[in-house]
């Protein structure tokens, strides 16, 4: 992952945390009776969207990075086996 992706991920996570803390405080104040909550369904859906966007973005980026690493390892291992004239060791298995 690049530094830009890490910065964007951290800022997205902080935004989600702040929005959720704000919602929890509103619910707490409403429960105590100090605050009357506005019914704003769009804010709720925005928070859910940001949360799932954050999760999906990082899961997909993690899977894509792992697939690239796995594919690279498999290709390197196969080329090692094909190019080696006699023996090659791949994952502790002796291939002749």
UniProtKB/Swiss-Prot annotation:
The chain crosses the membrane at residues 1-21. It comes from the Eukaryota. One of its GO terms (cellular component) is membrane. Keywords: Membrane, Transmembrane, Transmembrane helix. It is found in: Membrane. Its main location: membrane. The keyword Nucleotide-binding does not apply. The keyword DNA-binding does not apply. It is a single-pass membrane protein. This is Putative uncharacterized protein YOL013W-B. It comes from Saccharomyces cerevisiae (strain ATCC 204508 / S288c).
């Amino acid at each position: 992952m690049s530094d830009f992706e890490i910065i964007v991920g951290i800022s997205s996570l902080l935004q989600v945390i702040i929005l959720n803390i704000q919602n929890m405080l509103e619910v707490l104040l409403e429960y105590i009776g100090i605050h009357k909550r506005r019914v704003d369904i769009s804010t709720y859906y925005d928070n859910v969207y940001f949360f799932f966007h954050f999760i999906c973005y990082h899961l997909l980026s993690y899977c894509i990075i792992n697939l690239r690493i796995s594919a690279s390892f498999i290709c390197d291992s196969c080329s090692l086996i094909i190019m080696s004239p006699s023996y090659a060791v791949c994952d502790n298995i002796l291939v002749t």
